């Protein structure tokens, strides 16, 4: 298996300090969750040691579509119906603040170019328009697009433009988080698999393996199951066709074009 596209550019990750003895928190997992956790804790003054079985961002955090999107998996109008208007608004505003914080930390790993969510058919168009109406009613920045430019013209009956979304270079982003965590005082241990909680010299432990079963807490392994998708990257195309991330079929098909004109496309069936 070759090197994943997003990880092909990665520099060495700084190891940070080497803590002796017991640390305040051990973080297991060197993806976006683990590195974010390590950064936040170390910046607050905690002695942190992060363990990664392979290398930083080598899991799902470095192998994905590279989208940075506001909101959750549920359409906003459905979230309003199930959670209530104020709770839904609060959650969506939280994700907007998260994107702002990401922009502060990510540098050139995040480009705020917006995203376009396309309706595959009339049924999905109705779903997207209901979400658009709910977002507009609650004061969120969003635009409805009826006429799409080439090469999309005539293929999709409508779309929502989310202007605050962005395109993410995920491997670079997670490595940048790791570097900031190290600068804040976190110790990073790559190529260090954790086989047992008993071997961790820490007051507290954060399991940040996300979709990958760690075996450390069997109850969690039963609750979280990984699901595989596919992402491919082309050679550079002759021209820029897609200036922002695009996704359709309720998020199961997605693509974007990078500044070097490569097309990165993925999906799940």
Task: Mark where each language-model region is.
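Active-site substrate-recognition segment that forms the wall
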Residues: 68, 106-111, 202-269
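Glycine-rich nucleotide phosphate-binding loop and flanking beta-alpha elements
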Residues: 34, 195, 212-214
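Helical element adjacent to the flavin cofactor pocket in flavoenzyme catalytic cores
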Residues: 126-127, 133-138, 156-203, 208
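Glycine-rich FAD pyrophosphate-binding loop
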Residues: 43-63
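N-terminal Rossmann-like FAD-binding beta1-loop-alpha1 element of flavoenzymes
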Residues: 23-50
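Helix-loop-beta segment of a Rossmann-like dinucleotide-binding subdomain
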Residues: 15, 108-119, 147-176, 268
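Extreme N-terminal leader/targeting segments of oxidoreductases
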Residues: 1-25, 43
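Dinucleotide-binding Rossmann-like beta1-alpha1 core, especially the glycine-rich loop
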Residues: 71-147
């Amino acid at each position: 298996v070759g090197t994943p596209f997003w990880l092909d550019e990665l520099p060495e990750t700084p190891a940070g300090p080497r803590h002796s003895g017991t640390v305040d928190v051990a973080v297991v997992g060197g993806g976006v969750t683990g590195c974010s956790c390590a950064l936040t804790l170390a910046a607050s003054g905690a002695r942190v040691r992060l363990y990664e079985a392979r290398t930083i961002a080598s899991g799902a955090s470095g192998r994905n579509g590279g989208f940075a999107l506001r909101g959750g998996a549920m359409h906003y109008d459905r979230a309003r119906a199930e959670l209530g208007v104020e709770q839904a608004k609060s959650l969506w505003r939280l994700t907007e603040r998260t994107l702002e914080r990401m922009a502060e930390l990510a540098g050139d790993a995040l480009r705020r170019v917006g995203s376009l969510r396309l309706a595959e058919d009339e049924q999905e168009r109705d779903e997207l328009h209901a979400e658009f109406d709910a977002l507009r009613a609650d004061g969120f920045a969003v635009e409805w697009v009826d006429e799409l430019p080439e090469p999309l013209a005539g293929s999709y009956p409508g779309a929502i433009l989310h202007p605050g979304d962005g395109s993410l270079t995920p491997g670079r982003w997670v490595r940048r988080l790791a570097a900031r965590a190290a600068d804040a005082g976190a110790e990073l241990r790559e190529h260090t698999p954790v086989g047992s909680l008993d071997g961790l010299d820490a007051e507290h432990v954060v399991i940040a393996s996300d979709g990958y079963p760690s075996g450390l807490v069997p109850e969690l392994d039963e609750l979280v199951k990984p699901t595989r998708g596919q992402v491919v990257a082309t050679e550079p195309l002759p021209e820029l066709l897609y200036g922002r991330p695009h996704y359709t079929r309720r998020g199961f098909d997605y693509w974007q074009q990078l500044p070097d004109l490569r097309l990165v496309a993925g999906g799940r069936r």
